[in-house]
Amino acid sequence: MSWSLCSTHGVSSSIALTYGFRHRRRSTFRIFATSDGLEPKDDPPESPLPSSSSALGKDLKKVVNKTAATFAPRASTASKNPALPGTTLYKVFEVQGYASMFLGGVLSFNLLFPSSEPDLWRLMGMWSIWMFTIPSLRARDCPSKEKEALNYLFLIVPLLNVAIPFFWKSFALVWSADTVAFFAMYAWKLGWLERTE
């Protein structure tokens, strides 16, 4: 039996999976991925800007959303998200997300289960934002700007966690960089620093 992955031309978000046995007919399946099992919703049309940076921003947003929709945890059924704002489940996910960020900091700074050697606890602390905080916050039914910020973070944090140790081997520094990236992305996407008049 042989398996091969090949991309199809003309279909942007699908993969053709081909398998076959010797001396038998080959079959091809197309697999389509969406963020939550539903067809993707179109964003409201934005005013066209002549600059190339807006086109680049749109393309980047599209790639990030597609990648996060493919690899980030999501609902397995096509049901409405029960973690709506104001519900207990929404609060549970929110508290879980920020508590795991805090606990990750405590672990990566070697305050809980201290050791003089690198160990699993410090490693878990370093990766806590990517493993627990971002998925917990993405599980809520949050506004589209916040979901977009979390999609970007889902891709940026692993890059930071892998790249920083090449230059400075510190669990605390990696966790700190992840935290700065987290709040900087929220500030950028949610407009925390914009002036209101």
Curated annotation (Swiss-Prot):
Renumbered residue ranges of the record's region Disordered: 35-56
GO cellular component, one term: membrane
Subcellular location: Plastid, Chloroplast; Membrane
Keyword S-adenosyl-L-methionine attached: no
InterPro entries: RPH1
Positions of transmembrane segments: 93-113, 120-140, 150-170, 173-193
Membrane topology, as annotated: Multi-pass membrane protein
Keywords on record: Chloroplast, Membrane, Plant defense, Plastid, Transit peptide, Transmembrane, Transmembrane helix
GO biological process assignments: defense response; hydrogen peroxide biosynthetic process; positive regulation of defense response to oomycetes
Phenotype of the disrupted gene, per the record: Small plants with reduced chlorophyll content. Susceptiblility to the oomycete pathogen P.brassicae despite recognition and rapid induction of hypersensitive response (HR) but associated with a reduced oxidative burst (e.g. H(2)O(2)), a runaway cell-death response, and specific deficiencies in the expression of established markers of immune and stress hormone signaling (e.g. PR1, PDF1.2, AIG1, EDS1 and PAD4).
Location (main, coarse): plastid
Organelle transit peptide: 1-52
Function: Plays a positive role in the immune response to the oomycetes P.brassicae, including induced oxidative burst (e.g. H(2)O(2)) and enhanced expression of defense-related genes.
PANTHER family referenced in this protein's UniProt entry, alphabetically: PROTEIN RESISTANCE TO PHYTOPHTHORA 1, CHLOROPLASTIC
Protein name in the entry: Protein RESISTANCE TO PHYTOPHTHORA 1, chloroplastic
Organism annotation: Arabidopsis thaliana
